[in-house]
Structures are given as structure tokens and as C-alpha cells.
From Swiss-Prot:
InterPro entries xrefs: Amidase (IPR000120), Amidase_CS (IPR020556), Amidase_dom (IPR023631), AS_sf (IPR036928)
Active site: K74, S149, S173
Protein name per the record: Indoleacetamide hydrolase
Organism: Agrobacterium vitis (Rhizobium vitis)
UniProt pathway: Plant hormone metabolism; auxin biosynthesis
MF annotations from Gene Ontology: hydrolase activity
Tree of life domain: Bacteria
Keywords on record: Auxin biosynthesis, Crown gall tumor, Hydrolase, Plasmid
Gene symbol of the encoding locus: TA-iaaH
Length: 467
């Protein structure tokens, strides 16, 4: 067994020949087998993984590029290795021979197909409590949700079953599970990553994203996926101007989350960060007008198109009829049967609310000369599995989906890059994450800022899933 470190550190150790690629792979396989109860992984090919590791060792180039690094791919991303099911029964036998360009770029750089990650069915939820494939469990407390919809990838990375992972994020689905599992989650500027051969929710909002142990790992994977290998230069904290839009993003926080956020802000201020407390005008109304109308309207059209292009043998009605998770079935059927979102509402959301939301962010950054904004990724920590519709938050019963996506949803709708960082643990030892967002196209600078914040915060905890 070899020590499991970050992806960046593992590459260094492989290059130094501290251990072989096969030894690394055997260690990860043993961890995956020991942590099966988390239900983080849907599909594996240990024989194939061992063969690929041995080939790398024979060639003597482990650690060059991404050679020797097993990754976890969310089950809605085509890899050419694992079934691309979106964790829904009708697609259980869907195994595209051609991988997505994201997977292809990573494999070309030497990354290994480690596993397929369990997820919320069809990406339509944030708990990863999937009635078809079973609930994914939070590695910090297996009775709690890991977040979603990329919950399996986040749980696998947090448990160090895999050295990194690729999820998808429509409104929360990379950053939220990263926050609840205590790892780093990155949603890039919309359009930075290829989107082909990924089972969609909303083309206007969907993007792949990265879940990793640290920002340095995100940078390595981002450079390969984006094809933009620009060096991330260190940024001093002193002189950074970071916005705190308190009225929306800091409202009604769980006490433990509020304490972690206040502690983080105080720490960073003491290190030289200038915080600007100012709200983004009309943000809540603009986001509400753009959010669900776009996603709900686009989903049936996007899924039908995917099935026509890449499946052929499974119809849209087949997929809908076989949905097992009640929360997903209720949402999807309401749109299909009742036309919950009309064409007029959709066009208003896409042509009016969304552009105005994007303009509100641009004006806010320009007015206050900001480098980023900072807020708690979620207003609350992980809650018990099974509370898919409603959850008690600060003494009130609230909608589970709405409360968890509240803070991460607006920047998703605006197409902005966002990076969730773990900042601490609650008294119950549950992770708390905080997100920084930047303007569209500022991904490199946002990652550099994230690396500087991460170094100052110095969160270094992982769950002990093997004991």
C-alpha cells in the first residue's frame, strides 16, 4: 500500500519512482473495495485498470503528463469504458464507443479511467439519493447526503478512492457536493470545456466541472481539459478586493456555517484582503426569472436530441417511464404533462432575465473594482439521507433543493466561473465550503486567487473511511 496524496504530489512521486503505477492502482482498488458502503461508484474495470498501469510501468513514463492518475467520471459523461447511464434504468446498457472530448483529452494526457461515479438520477437533484442505483453516502457521516448531483465523484475524491474527478454542473452539481464532502469544486466559465457526449439537462447552463483535493489539482486538470496550459502565477492576498453580497448570500445561514464564514473572512482580512460589503441589485428577482424556467423548459428537448444522436434504441418516453426517484419523476412529469414552463416564459427568461443578470454581475464587479466575490457555498451543512423534498433549517421546514442551491445558482445562470473551497468543519465534523466567483473568462485569475485563499485557510482534513 502506498500513501495517497494529492494528484499533483502523486505525479511527482511517480516521476521520482517512489512507487510504481501498479502499486498506486492496487492501493486505490483496495480503498474502493473497503469503502463500498459509500456507494460512490457505479462501474469499475479493475482488470483493465491494472493492465493500463502495467503498460505505463513498462514504458517508464509514469507521472509524465497525467500518466498513471486514475480519475472518476460522473455517469452522464461518455468515457468509452463505462456505461453512460446518468444513473437511470432505461440507459443501463448505453455504452458509447466514442468518449466525450473531455475524457479523450484526459486519456490522451495519460489519465486512467478509474471509475464511473454514482449520481442523482438524470442530474435532476442535489442529494444523490438515487432510487435506481442507491443513495450515495457522505464519507464524513454515512447517514448524510454528499450533495449532488455529482455526489459519487465528490464522495470518491474526498475518501481518496480516486485522485480527482469530473462531474457536471447545471446549477450546483459540482460545487455543492464538493462543499458538503470537504473538497474543491470548480465550475468553469460556460463554454470553456467541451460539452459533447454528456447527457444534458440544460444546454444554456450545463458545463462539466472538476472535483479535486486541492486547487493545484484543479489547475492541472483544467489545463488539459481546456487546452489552455497557461501558468497560474502566485497572487498576494494583500490588495485583493473581494465582494461580500451579504443580503442574499449571507441571509438565514445555519449557525455553524455562519461561524465558519465569519472566521474565514476575519482570517483573510488579517492577511491583507480588502472586503467590500455591497449587494448585487435585483439579484434574487433576476435569478428567479432565469433559473428554473430555462432548465425545466430545455431538459425535454435536450434529452430527446441526445437520445436521437447517440442512443437510437431508447426513446424519451422510455427514459421518463423508467425513472425511479420520486423527486425526479415529479419534476420531469410536471413539465411534460402540464407544460409548467411556457414558450413565452422561456423566451423571457433567456432573452431578458438572463442577460440582465449577467449585466448585474458585470456592473457590480466594475463599480466596486472587485477581483472576486465570496460566500458560503451552501447555507447549511449536510443533512440526513431521505429528506429529498423538505428539510428543517433554522427551525423551519424548507424546500431541500431551493435551500441548497440558493447561493450557487445565480452565477451558474450567468455563466460565470466558481470555485468552492473547504474552509472548516462544524462541531459535528461536517465540512463547510465557501465559493469565490469571478467574471466570465477570468478562470485563470480565479484559480490563482483560490490557490492564495486555500494556502491561508490551510484546511487539511479528510474523512477516515477505512476505519
Amino acid at each position: 500500500m502506498v500513501p495517497i496524496t494529492s494528484l499533483a504530489q502523486t505525479l511527482e512521486r511517480l516521476r521520482r519512482k517512489d512507487y510504481s503505477c501498479l502499486e498506486l492502482v492496487e492501493t486505490l482498488i483496495a480503498r474502493c473495495e473497503a469503502a463500498k458502503a459509500l456507494n460512490a461508484l457505479l462501474a469499475t474495470d479493475w482488470g483493465g485498470l491494472r493492465r493500463r498501469a502495467k503498460k505505463i510501468d513498462r514504458h517508464g513514463n509514469a507521472g509524465v503528463g497525467l500518466r498513471g492518475i486514475p480519475l472518476c467520471f460522473k455517469a452522464n459523461i461518455a468515457t468509452g469504458i463505462f456505461p453512460t447511464t446518468a444513473a437511470t434504468p432505461a440507459l443501463i446498457n448505453h455504452l458509447p464507443k466514442i468518449p466525450s472530448r473531455i475524457a479523450e483529452r484526459l486519456f490522451s494526457a495519460g489519465a486512467l479511467p478509474g471509475a464511473s461515479g454514482n449520481m442523482h438520477e438524470l442530474s435532476f437533484g442535489i442529494t444523490s439519493n438515487n432510487y435506481a442505483t442507491g443513495a450515495v453516502r457522505n464519507p464524513w457521516n454515512p447517514s448524510l447526503i454528499p450533495g449532488g448531483s455529482s455526489g459519487g465523484v465528490a464522495a470518491a475524491v474526498a475518501s481518496r478512492l480516486m485522485l480527482g474527478g469530473i462531474g457536471t454542473d447545471t446549477g450546483a452539481s459540482v460545487r455543492l457536493p464538493a462543499a458538503l464532502c470537504g473538497v474543491v469544486g470548480f465550475r468553469p466559465t460556460l463554454g470553456r470545456y467541451p460539452r459533447d457526449r454528456i447527457i444534458p439537462v440544460s444546454p444554456t447552463r450545463d458545463t462539466a466541472g472538476i472535483i479535486a483535493q486541492c486547487v493545484a489539482d484543479v489547475v492541472i486538470l483544467d489545463q488539459v481539459i481546456s487546452g489552455r496550459p497557461a501558468r497560474i502565477l502566485p497572487i498576494p492576498l494583500k490588495g485583493l478586493r473581494i465582494g461580500l453580497p451579504t443580503t442574499y448570500f449571507y441571509d438565514d445561514l445555519d449557525a455553524d456555517v455562519a461561524f465558519a464564514a465569519e472566521t474565514t473572512i476575519r482570517l483573510l482580512a488579517n492577511r491583507g484582503v480588502t472586503f467590500v460589503e455591497a449587494d448585487i441589485p435585483h439579484l434574487e428577482d433576476l435569478n428567479s426569472g432565469a433559473s428554473l424556467p430555462i432548465a425545466l423548459y430545455e431538459f425535454p428537448h435536450a434529452l430527446k436530441q441526445y437520445l436521437d444522436d447517440f442512443v437510437g434504441t431508447v426513446s424519451f418516453s422510455d427514459v421518463i417511464k423508467e425513472i425511479r426517484s420520486p423527486d425526479v419523476a415529479n419534476i420531469v412529469n410536471a413539465q411534460i404533462d402540464g407544460h409548467q414552463i411556457s414558450n413565452a416564459e422561456y423566451e423571457l427568461a433567456r432573452q431578458s432575465f438572463r442577460p440582465r443578470l449577467q449585466a448585474a454581475y458585470r456592473n457590480y464587479f466594475r463599480l466596486y473594482r472587485l477581483d472576486a466575490i465570496l460566500f458560503p457555498t451552501a447555507p447549511l451543512a449536510a443533512k440526513a439521507i431521505g429528506q429529498d423534498s423538505s428539510v428543517i433549517h433554522n427551525g423551519s421546514m424548507v424546500n431541500t433543493f431551493k435551500i441548497y442551491v440558493r447561493n450557487v445558482d445565480p452565477s451558474s445562470n450567468a455563466g460565470l466561473p466558481g470555485l468552492s473551497l473547504p474552509v472548516g468543519l462544524t462541531p459535528d465534523r461536517l465540512p463547510v465550503g465557501m465559493e469565490i466567483d469571478g467574471l466570465a473568462g477570468s478562470d485563470h485569475r480565479l484559480l490563482a486567487i483560490g490557490a492564495a485563499l486555500e494556502k491561508a485557510i490551510n484546511f487539511r482534513s479528510f474523512p477516515d473511511v477505512l476505519n
